[in-house]
Amino acid sequence: MNIRATSGVLGVIGHPVAHSFSPDMHNAAIDALGIDFCYVAFHVLPERVGEALQGLKGLNIRGLNVTIPHKLAVMEHLDRISEEALAVGAVNTISNEEGELVGYNTDVYGVVTALERAAGLEAFPPQVVVLGAGGAARAVVYALGSRREVGQLTLLNRTVERAEALALDMEKITGKPISVGRLDADTQARTFAGAGLVVNTTSLGMHPNVEETPLMAEGAVHSQLVLYDTVFNPLETRMMAQFRDVGAPVCGGLDMLVYQGARSFQIWTGMEPPTDVMKEVVVRRFA
């Protein structure tokens, strides 16, 4: 990569940010396309978010990704926010459009595209079960609840009250009925029976606790039940292995990571990035 005085600057802000895969993915895409950009990581403390975004304007940085814990905090400093980002309540991409800062949420695109391309879903099933009720669940529920084919969503969470609050909020936005249950074996067995897709948005199974799994009713898994696990470290979670054991289709969190990043890249550059190159560079980091 040759960085010149004319190079457009892209980046990611977070606290911490050293663990981010985004510089690897985006710089690989930049190299593959041969365009005059570079992508760097900025460690921004929570109390400096507003200053960082003023710097984005002042330095004419083309765009930023936003990671934990700033996805909500940046919103008050933006000039415009997309409909999806407002619905999800979080911004993970900022575009500097001639001095106007516009916030987007590309996780929604990442969820849908990962399921279509990586899981091979030609049509979304009418019944979907989502495990968890945190920030990742919100993006997933909005993405799937916005699909015409999906008629019923069920949220399972260890804290039922949190799931109820999310369901009430997202029912108003999506217009879809959302039922709620406790994340336990009995409820999984009951809800998995009629579902065509299960999405894990919990951190269970994430490195370093790779032996954990949110699957408590293994007997309820069948070969027609698609799993989408948003965890991407490790690349193959224990839950994914449990579904594979019965011949069920699975999709891991790496695909969402790549596709949400690809959508950000499109917003900033107007170009379609090579997602195979972006995915390969992340896989190599795990090797």
Language model feature labels by segment:
Residues 3-6, 123-124, 147-149, 215-224:
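Short, conserved loop/helix-junction motifs that constitute active-site signature segments
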Residues 66-73, 135-136, 203-206, 233:
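Short glycine-rich anion-binding loops that position phosphate/pyrophosphate groups of nucleotides
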Residues 14, 103-108, 115, 119, ...:
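Glycine-rich adenosine-cofactor-binding loop
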Residues 3-120:
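Phosphate/diphosphate ligand-binding glycine-rich loop within oxidoreductases
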Residues 147-174:
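NAD(P)-binding Rossmann-fold cofactor-contacting core
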Residues 224-226, 230-287:
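Adenosine-phosphate binding glycine-rich loop
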Residues 175-250:
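Rossmann-like adenosine-cofactor binding region
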Residues 40, 154, 251:
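Conserved beta-strand positions in the Rossmann-like core of class I SAM-dependent methyltransferases
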